């Protein structure tokens, strides 16, 4: 098992939102969280990715509390694509996808040949090769979503947390992503 949530509680402005939630995410399994708008799916992703911290309960990764990991070590295990990404608009696709390799670099270390191969693989996997030198701001919403997916894939993590990963994508790409 990779990730486990045990009896977590989370509140927004002292109003209980998630109460006593427990769930296990097993290795080599795809787990989908389905529910109506406002039911806490994105909040759970924020908790799993350490953006929010649960009021009570624990979230473990390989039997270790997620908060006990250093940021880079956590990022080597968990990649996240959020529902809304509004940053890096003035950077090109290849640079943004390359940010997925940052957890593996030391301060001021350059990308290796292996890193560039992984970046090229992530770009090809998400069908972005023809856009790799374009600025993110000049891409459609669906193309931008694929850039975020490529960046997460470039992290080469055992866990991918995807919040509405097919938003803005054409049906063709929705099917490919879900495969």
Locate the predicted segments by residue.
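Hydrophobic anchor residue at the start of the ABC signature
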Residues: 149-150, 177
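Helix-to-loop junction immediately C-terminal to a conserved catalytic motif
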Residues: 49
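Catalytic Walker B motif of ABC-type/P-loop ATPase nucleotide-binding domains
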Residues: 160-164
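Conserved ABC ATPase "signature" region
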Residues: 98, 113-131, 156
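Conserved ABC transporter NBD signature motif
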Residues: 57-65, 74
């Amino acid at each position: 098992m990779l990730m486990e949530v045990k009896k977590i509680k989370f509140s927004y402005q002292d109003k209980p939102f998630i109460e006593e939630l427990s769930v296990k995410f097993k290795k080599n399994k795809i787990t989908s969280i389905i529910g109506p708008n406002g039911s806490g799916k994105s909040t759970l992703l924020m908790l799993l990715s350490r953006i929010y911290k649960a009021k009570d309960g624990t979230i473990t990764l390989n039997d270790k509390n997620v908060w006990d990991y250093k940021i880079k070590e956590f990022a080597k295990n968990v990649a996240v694509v959020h529902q809304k990404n509004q940053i890096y608009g003035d950077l090109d696709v290849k640079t943004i996808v390359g940010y997925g390799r940052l957890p593996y670099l030391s301060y001021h270390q350059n990308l290796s040949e292996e890193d560039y191969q992984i970046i090229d693989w992530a770009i090809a996997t998400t069908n972005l090769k023809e856009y790799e030198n374009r600025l993110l701001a000049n891409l459609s919403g669906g193309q931008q979503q694929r850039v975020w997916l490529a960046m997460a894939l470039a992290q080469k993590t055992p866990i991918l947390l995807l919040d509405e990963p097919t938003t803005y994508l054409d049906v063709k790409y929705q099917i490919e992503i879900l495969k």
